Amino acid sequence: MSTENTLSVADLARENVRNLVPYQSARRLGGNGDVWLNANEFPTAVEFQLTQQTLNRYPECQPKAVIENYAQYAGVKPEQVLVSRGADEGIELVIRAFCEPGKDAILYCPPTYGMYSVSAETIGVERRTVPALENWQLDLQGISDNLDGAKVVFVCSPNNPTGQLINPQDLRTLLELTRGKAIVVADEAYIEFCPQATLAGWLVKYPHLVILRTLSKAFALAGLRCGFTLANEEVINLLLKVIAPYPLSTPVADIAAQALSPQGINVMRDRVAQTVQERQYLVNALQQTACVEHVFDSETNYILARFTASSSVFKSLWDQGIILRDQNKQPSLSGCLRITVGTRQENQRVIDALRAEPV
């Protein structure tokens, strides 16, 4: 066979995968910093001791202790909980279970979390965007106009990267608009920082509501890769058909169960209180910093701010080993950087570096 007729391995791949721009995670973007404030992680490590040593056996598909502990914590039934490799896997499972590639669409409202788009594109499902309003709330009319053929609507509340909660009345309206037509996924990755805003209590009324949760943020376990999907039992049973047979390793399940014990949850809540206190310190300091044009309200463990010269500020801090998250490419976020709330020492380094910037 001539070399002219030989396909490269890349040519054998699906066209949408060849054209795919992968999600630019904080770790993928790299950097050589010692102050990492770009991934909304908790700034200090937590310690656990493994209690399960049966690594010669496959783990449970849905570890009973993890499911029961999370159900009790979230105020739902165990049958309404699915555990997965981070909330990102939950995003993918919902799309795989409900969307026909080449036929159905997902819908989301930028600026928002990038994995909704990447997961849909990977699977070959159409992506529709309805940009958020100027105040970053939902454009309900725009969503209504684009619902035909959309099987899944993603809403992040509090929203990443903007930090604000979505108006609960708008969420109710969205759930009524989509009843019998589409699944609504409420991404609550940051809900521990504003627990009063959870939609978990709405599952009784809305059979098409799905809620995503994670241990990566307030539980300080980003390295564990453990997330949860809350939904009615009918939805959970569908997702169980498409999830991998052993999504959680034994060590992950072991640590997750410990983190979700009453003691673990109390420690998490103390951590949240500490983070909220540091967030206010950082907000106050940013508001008194010359190169900062505006600091947006936040209900999370990060702050979005608009700068007079964000690109040069980002690079200057990067060169000093302070790694922030550039949001300039997100719709309506020109001039914006996202700053994870760190320790007091890290937050002070950010402020000192910003105040040294030319205006």
From Swiss-Prot:
Pathway: Amino-acid biosynthesis; L-histidine biosynthesis; L-histidine from 5-phospho-alpha-D-ribose 1-diphosphate: step 7/9
PROSITE patterns linked: AA_TRANSFER_CLASS_2
Residue positions where N6-(pyridoxal phosphate)lysine is found in the record: K217
EC number: 2.6.1.9
Biological processes per GO annotation: L-histidine biosynthetic process
This protein's UniProt keywords: Amino-acid biosynthesis, Aminotransferase, Histidine biosynthesis, Pyridoxal phosphate, Transferase
GO molecular function terms attached to this record: histidinol-phosphate transaminase activity; pyridoxal phosphate binding
Cofactor(s) annotated in UniProt: pyridoxal 5'-phosphate
Reaction catalysed by this enzyme: L-histidinol phosphate + 2-oxoglutarate = 3-(imidazol-4-yl)-2-oxopropyl phosphate + L-glutamate
Highest taxon above the source species: Bacteria
Pfam families, per the entry: Aminotran_1_2
CDD domains referenced in this protein's UniProt entry, alphabetically: AAT_like (cd00609)
Family that this chain belongs to: Belongs to the class-II pyridoxal-phosphate-dependent aminotransferase family. Histidinol-phosphate aminotransferase subfamily.
Subunit structure: Homodimer.
Protein name: Histidinol-phosphate aminotransferase
Protein source organism: Salmonella typhi
